[in-house]
Regions:
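Short, conserved beta-strand element in jelly-roll/cupin
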Residues: 50-54, 65-82, 122-126
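Short acidic-glycine-tyrosine-enriched beta hairpin
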Residues: 85-101
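Conserved short histidine dyad/triad with adjacent acidic residue
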Residues: 31-36, 49-65, 100
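Ligand-binding loop in jelly-roll beta-barrel domains
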Residues: 100-129
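A short, N-terminal "cap"/entry segment at the start of jelly-roll beta-barrel domains
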Residues: 1-45, 132-177
């Protein structure tokens, strides 16, 4: 059985893998080091992550989740959280709730302090998930797939904009059966 305890003071944070690192102008605004804790803990329906933001950076674009709920506990540092049309100052000890929904629940944490901002992120792990990005007009579809030959789960990911939508029948003029 997986040991159901992890001490967050003994966890190593790592930057995003190169394939998910922000590039170009986005690199000026986003940086995140994190440790994913759910699988090492053996969690099935909740996700846990320890996150660290350097001064002046956000970890993710302003986004909402249609299925999953998130909660953040600020462990150290200070910053701000933008939720919908409002922005709130945050500091050590603050607990932030981000329920599922549309643009009114979109959220983003930014480090506006002078030292590292650390927080624990907790979320439900429902799938598939649809995220919306109100600032850029994008949406993302995410789903975990069956494990591959290596035993690791597969992943489906699509990022787009509504105007890129295909007609349901596009490309279906061929063999009907």
């Amino acid at each position: 059985m997986t040991r159901p305890i992890v001490n967050i003071h003994e966890v190593s944070l790592v930057p995003r893998p190169a394939e998910f690192a922000p590039e170009g102008p986005a690199a000026e605004h986003f940086a995140l080091s994190s440790a994913q804790l759910a699988r090492p803990l053996g969690a099935k329906k909740l996700g846990y992550g320890l996150c660290a933001l350097p001064p002046g950076k956000a970890g993710y674009p302003f986004h909402s989740h249609r299925e999953n709920e998130e909660m953040f506990l600020v462990l150290q540092g200070s910053g701000e959280v933008r939720i919908g049309a409002e922005t709130y100052p945050i500091r050590e000890g603050d607990l932030i709730a981000c329920p599922p929904g549309g643009p009114e629940t979109a959220h983003q944490i930014r480090n506006t302090g002078t030292a590292e901002l650390r927080y624990l992120a907790v979320s439900t792990r429902l799938g598939p998930e649809i995220c919306e990005y109100p600032d850029s007009g994008k949406f993302g579809v995410y789903a975990e797939l069956a494990p591959g030959k290596d035993g690791k789960p597969g992943y489906f990911y699509f990022m787009g904009r509504p105007e890129q939508q295909l007609d349901y029948w596009a490309g279906e003029g061929g063999n009907p059966g």
